[in-house]
Amino acid sequence: MLCAQSLYANGFKIQEQSLNATALSSAYIAGARGADASYYNPANMGFENDWGENKSEFELATSLINIPGFNFDVATNNQVLYSKTTLQFNKNPVIDLGPLGKMDIEGLIKLGAGIFESLNDLFKPIILEHSTPDSQIVTGGTGDTALVVPKMFYKSRTMHGITFGGSFVASSGLAMQWAGKGGEFLQDVFIMMVEANPSVSYTINNRLSFGFGYRVMYAMGKFNNVVYVPLDKEGGGISLNQEQIINLAKHPEAVNALIPESIKNQIGPILNKLGTLSSSLIIPGCNTNGVECVNWGVLMGNVDGEKTNLFGTSKVYQKSEGKDLSTGFRLSASLRVFDNGMLSVVYNSPVKFDMAGKVEALTYVGGAMGNVLTTANLNIAVQMPEILALAYAQEVFDKRLRIEGVYERTFWSRGWKFNVTPDFENATYTGLSGLVALKDVFSSETLKQMVGIADFGVVSNMGAGWRDTNTFRLGLTYKSKNMRLMASTAYDAAPSPQDKVGIPDSDGYMVGAGAKFNLRGFDFGLAGSWTFKQSMSSLYHSGGLGGLFIYTASLGYRW
């Protein structure tokens, strides 16, 4: 696949928030100046901006995030689903055969087996196929995705070494609709994380500065997707007691749907041969091509118990949503090296979310069994990772050219990335069709037992196996009295495993460019950042390069 085009821009963080960061591929830490320093490096708010001023500043930026459409091929998780049912017959003589007296159902079957040997199959498990598997490779795709995201940045004038600032950004987000069998896993996804970040810095002698930012983040998400869940790995199965089976016998049309054709084709001829002796086992006035219709309800009434095991995977269509408010912090420090260099370090703490919400999961058992709707409370555990960045910027050619290099370590391996935990214990279970819709047979507790054999743990943690990553950024800024020109490149490693179905991604190679102009206290500009990804390193293949493109425009005012 085009690797979800960085689905969340390598993981689920989008670093390119301001115009400067977009143009510089986020190689903008030691060289951060002005209003957006409140977000990227609060310590630098205390230094003069690139126009040589100590002023209050406000900047409004708007980004267009574009993910080009793509098609892809991926291995499927959809296996065949079949059931194996074992019946325990009543030993009491409950069937009246007239002159032959009464006989239990097992005796009747053995009597018939003397004529039709294959009737012994009734003592064997009844095997029914509920679904067919997909081909090993399935195709998916999505159209172009475009998001418009506004952002704001502010810093005050520095007084007595103290500077205040703040920012409001969308630090993560995604809205995509995936089509086809291959796209079912992320069929309709919307994620939004917004961050308000008040900050303060203290600068000593225009040489050493410390900064602190308090991160207040709100996260929400809505997800409609399809997963294929393994069933009954422990072999526990589903059991009906005698009362439930007696109630099932009251629905002969439902029972009839459960009996394999091979057995139906043998019982009818036996009843024909028995004639009036089998009157209690036939439906009066009903025959097909001269063969009596069997009253399967009466037969099932003579079953003490049953056990059904399900094998393979069941299709589950999920609709879920969740939201949460959480906090973190940002620490930074900058040291001026001689007159033309700046060394900076920035630490972003992890921000943990427990997004509370609801989930509706429709489990497709299929066949005569039908489908079960589960409604439950839900918790989605997501952690924005901690990030440590080390940067150095050097100004040359009479401070007209700034060269900045950034090393960034993102600790993806710590904490949950996308762990979904439904409260199945206190959920509501409803049978929507087939046998499971018979409330006198399948109680809520039985439906709970049925859903309980599904191994949702296989698909509940889509961030499993993520690793810490390194990012390397290089930016160039040319400065004149009324203009700044910027260009950059970066390499951003993907945290997610490339050989698993989950949140897909692959390493990104970035380039950026932009310009900002100064006019009578105002500044305005345009910038672009282009991330390219090679799909062949991912489990999701499409060939060629994927892309994540960000275009940012800004307008600032200084006073």
Which residues make up each language-model segment?
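Surface-exposed strand-loop-strand hairpins of Gram-negative outer-membrane beta-barrel proteins
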Residues: 29-33, 66-145
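Outer-membrane beta-barrel porins/channels
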Residues: 8-25, 98-129, 138, 147-559
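Transmembrane beta-strand segments of Gram-negative outer membrane beta-barrel proteins
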Residues: 13-28, 49-72
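N-terminal signal peptide c-region/cleavage motif recognized by signal peptidases
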Residues: 4-6
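Outer-membrane beta-barrel pore proteins
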Residues: 29-31, 42-51, 155-158, 173
